[in-house]
Amino acid sequence: MKERYHLLDALRGFAIYHVIIFHFLYDVYVVYGLNLDWPYQTWVQLWQRNGCGLFVLVSGMVFALGRNTFKRGLQLQILGLIITLATYVFAPSEVIYYGILTFFGSAMWLTLLVKVFLQRIPAILGMLASVVCYVLAKDVAMGVASFFGRKLFEFPEWLYQNCFAILGFHSNTFYSSDYVPLLPHIFLFWFGMYLFAWLRERKLTHLLTGGNYKIFTWPGTHSLEIYILHQPILMGLCYVIFGRTP
């Protein structure tokens, strides 16, 4: 019987709670127009970034388990495409291009493609390199690579076309209500992968078997289904609260 890492399930469940609460408030304040400036507040952006980051990091750790990763990546890519088409048709003002599901599918495939090279890097060095690369790439949307606020160089302007949006480069006309590009998030995904490898090397993975609290582990083990269903349910709830469509 395979060992279950309950702490990973719990962390993923915690992250999905974050997603539900954040999207409910987004629907109330932005979609229903109560406060259109809400998503631009500093604390909201930090909340969104940290919640997304936790999801990505944990997913990188789960990827290291190596369970049906290609098939899982394909499933996520298809679901991401369906969400893009659905929002484009039924909610064009909140259309989603390259959202979190598309990112996970792309991250899995890209990692599989270069896995033979990544595995040659010692886990501790891989974690360190992932952190450095994440910091360097976090301002790619602003056209620069920086290191703790110090600009190192500018990316070529020709990169900033919408055809490269999945990578993190896009024009000023690009919009997506849920946008998780490969840069810088792939490095957080790889950090999670190397973190699990480091724990496994030191025989510390038993630390991940604790935390079996159903309130977190249950949604963690059903995170994909919950993610797909939560937004239609939230929009239905908002319709009941406000008595109208947006």
Regions found by a protein language model. Name each.
Residues 1-246:
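Alpha-helical transmembrane segments and their immediate juxtamembrane cytosolic regions
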